[in-house]
Regions:
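Conserved AMP-binding/adenylate-forming core of the ANL superfamily
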Residues: 28-59, 64-73, 77-81, 98-103, ...
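Conserved AMP-binding/adenylate-forming
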Residues: 293, 297-424, 431-434, 449
Length: 553
């Protein structure tokens, strides 16, 4: 096996040929506890080529759309690489999508073929089944359904160009407006090269995959980049519940992980913070010994993640400042990645040596970032990006595509930020989330939520505007509220005291314009996106809270 050297690739076909040629005997994918069901780079190529030939025989050629609806698994990569390097277009669908969402994506994308896992097969509507030319079981690659009348000859594949479409990724984000993001071969291939320059990984590295592969973060950094550098990716057979994740970490001992903030925030709030708070000695040491206690706990934290982690990438949402402050003091090898589906995704990052709490860092290799339409008083402006990784547009939606580009061709991220004297970017909040104060002030709910989330017992929160007032919707941490073990009167009394505490702490810490008027307690977890961001639009006007339930009684 050759030693890893930078190799320029501008299509995923070239990436596929490069990885499977250079690392032939090296393991590419496998389950966390067995090689059975996994692939070396060589056997991976054989399988992908075989499945591609099957698609060709069923009349599926270049330009045809092929959907993948499955949880993460080794065969997900096989499906993807049997589609894209041969000129077809992949339509990944998030595994937690509803039957209606799947149907809408299939219809809008005009997909002809569907790879579906056995776990997700129950969410395929009869409408989709009737429309499909071909359906394939992703667990076994057996043909579930074929329509002989819909193809009359073999499909013709082609060698894709950098400008050709590789995938259309559907994302509704936190706004609820689903859109198909069209990414070219150049978009994704360039971001793979960006990853190499941002964080060099080699064939010796081990990835533990815990994010859905249908999400662009895991697709690019967790599937395409390992293909480029020859690393091995390990998969879990089920969603990463704590017990399974801990077991997998001990077995795999990963060097590389890609996660969302919620995972490390749960570890911090559920284990690390209570440990410090319960001991006066630890609390004193943490405050007075220049982070020594954090570094000691940080060593244990690293051991929890298998003991070999050298890159713990956090992306998809903003990391809680208090948690990041701890990780920084603990010298934990985390990195912050910033990006969007529309940018393939990585456009900004903060690595070892220049991380600072709350900053997304600097632009990544081959990407330009700047602030657009800057407010001269506050220094706030919208982050705009330019580079080979920026999408072609939204599928079948030229009006929306035009709206997200400036007149001189910069992509508008909708993130409002400021820059410090060193050029580092700090996000204040989303343009779409911003609330206009009574005197015209820009109120960013994310800044208020950062304060609320550090109050004892708070797991997550969002701040919404209702009738000109700011209302905090709060979800308690697990086991903080004993819903079924206390009388109704005692429960309401405890909640009232807790809400008063949240209001007091929050309003002492935020500006006059950002004062919260009331707190409501969620009875159920917030509904989230694939990267665990709360779907804010669901709670703008109402929410399943204790207060609403009380009104109905």
């Amino acid at each position: 096996m050759q030693r890893m050297r930078e190799k320029y690739v501008d299509t995923l076909a070239k990436l596929y040929d490069y990885g499977t040629t250079v690392y032939t005997k090296k393991q590419y994918t496998q389950w966390y506890d067995t090689k059975e069901g996994g692939y070396t780079f060589g056997s991976f190529k054989e399988k992908c080529d075989s499945i591609s030939k099957k698609l060709t025989q069923y009349g599926i050629g270049a330009g045809d759309k092929v959907a993948i609806f499955s949880q993460s698994m080794p065969n997900w990569s096989v499906a993807f690489f049997s589609i894209v390097p041969f000129g077809r277009i992949a339509i990944p669908i998030l595994p937690d999508s509803s039957e209606n969402e799947v149907t809408n994506i299939i219809n809008h994308s005009e997909s002809k073929v569907l790879f579906v896992s056995q776990r997700n097969a129950g969410k395929i509507s009869q409408e989709v089944k009737d429309k499909m030319t071909l359906m394939i079981d992703l667990d076994t690659f057996e043909v579930l359904k074929s329509d002989d009348e819909k193809f009359t000859c073999d499909g013709k594949t082609s060698v894709p160009t950098p400008e050709d479409i590789a995938t259309i990724i559907y994302t509704s984000g936190t706004t609820g407006n689903a859109k198909g993001v069209v990414l070219s071969h150049r978009n994704l291939a360039s971001n793979v090269i960006t990853c190499y320059h941002s964080c060099k990984r080699t064939h010796k590295d081990r990835w533990l995959s815990i994010l859905p592969m249908a999400h662009v973060l895991e697709m690019t950094l967790g599937m395409l980049y390992p293909m480029y550098c020859g690393a091995t990716v390990y998969y879990l057979p089920k969603p990463p519940a704590a017990s399974l994740l801990m077991k997998a970490l001990k077995i795999v001992k990963p060097t590389t992980m890609l996660t969302v903030p919620m995972i490390i925030e749960k570890v911090y709030k559920g284990s690390i913070l209570p440990t410090i708070q319960k001991s006066r000695t630890l609390t004193w040491m943490n405050k007075n010994m220049n982070g020594l206690m954090c570094r000691i706990i940080g060593m244990k934290l690293k051991a929890t993640f298998g003991g070999h982690v050298t890159f713990y990438g956090i992306g998809g949402a903003k990391l809680d400042p208090e948690v990041e402050g701890f990780l920084l003091k603990a010298k934990f090898p985390y990195a912050i990645g910033y990006g969007l589906t529309e940018t393939s995704p990585l456009i900004g990052y903060a690595m070892h040596g220049w991380r600072t709490v709350g900053s997304l860092g600097y632009p990544v290799y081959n990407v330009q970032l700047k602030l657009h339409d800057v407010n001269p008083e506050t220094g706030e402006g919208e982050i705009v990006a330019k580079g080979p990784n920026v999408m072609l547009g939204y599928y079948k939606d030229p009006k929306r595509t035009k709206s997200v580009f400036t007149e001189d061709g910069w992509f508008r991220t909708s993130d409002i930020a400021v820059q410090d004297e060193k050029g580092r970017f700090y996000i204040k909040g989303r343009n779409s989330n911003m609330i206009l104060g009574p005197s015209g002030e820009n109120i960013y709910p994310e800044e208020i939520e950062n304060v609320i989330n550090n109050v004892e017992g708070v797991g997550e929160s969002i701040v919404v505007e209702r009738d000109g007032r700011l209302v905090a919707l709060v979800a308690p941490t697990e086991n903080f509220i004993s819903w079924d073990k206390e009388s109704e009167d005692k429960l309401y009394e405890k909640l009232d005291n807790w809400k008063s505490k949240i209001l007091k702490i929050t309003n002492k810490s935020v500006s006059k314009a950002s004062q919260v008027s009331s707190v409501e307690v969620m009875k159920e977890p917030f509904e989230k996106t694939a990267t665990q961001k709360i779907r804010r639009f669901k709670y703008k006007h109402s929410a399943p809270t204790v207060e609403e339930e009380k009104k109905e009684k």
